[in-house]
Amino acid sequence: MSDDAARLPAGTDLLRTVRMTLRLNAPPERVSRAWADPEELARWFPDRVEGGLAVGARTVLVWESQRVWWDVIESRIGELFVFRWPWLPDERLVTTVRITFAAAGYGTLLELEDGPFPLDRPGGIDAWAEAIEGWSEELARLRAYVDFSVDLRERQ
């Protein structure tokens, strides 16, 4: 048993999923393109996108300090975007991110799920906590970009 799992109360479900909801003032087609179009994605999330974001494609997201791959599993503009990616540098933990887009009034209701994060595996608890913090920040950046055309990423 890992040190992380040893600290959990008996009977604890050892899988966690990050779930977040965000309302945006743009239509679902616009919001989903911010995820599914490499040029749009690079305006708010990574510094650069290498490759396309087609279903079945492996794409690499590039930041100054890291490179992370995405495998796009499913994409329907205005409805759904699903991909897999690693949370740990050695790729011991790979999660599936499912993002849905639904019309809500004059805008979009975005629902994001990322997981599962196995709390009983080394690095699982830390990756889950990092995902909660990271997705909170990234969804704030998405809102700034889609609703206000503002890039909140830190620049050197």
Task: Describe the role of every protein-language-model region.
Residues M1-E50:
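Hydrophobic ligand-binding cavity/cleft-lining segments
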Residues R143-Q156:
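Short, highly charged C-terminal tails/helix-capping segments
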Residues L22, W70-E74, T95-A103:
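Hydrophobic/aromatic beta-strand elements that line small-molecule binding cavities or substrate pockets
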Residues F45-P89:
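Glycine-rich portal/gate segments that line the openings of hydrophobic small-molecule binding cavities
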Residues A26-P27, V60-L61, A127-E130:
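Alpha-helical scaffold segments that form or flank carboxylate-/histidine-based iron centers
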Residues P89-E137, R153-R155:
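Beta-strand/loop substructures that line and gate deep hydrophobic ligand-binding cavities in soluble
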Residues L15-T21, R58, R67, L80, ...:
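Intrinsic-disorder/low-complexity, polar/charged segments enriched in Ser/Thr/Lys/Arg/Asp/Glu/Gln
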Residues V31, L41, T59, V72, ...:
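Hydrophobic pocket/interface hotspot
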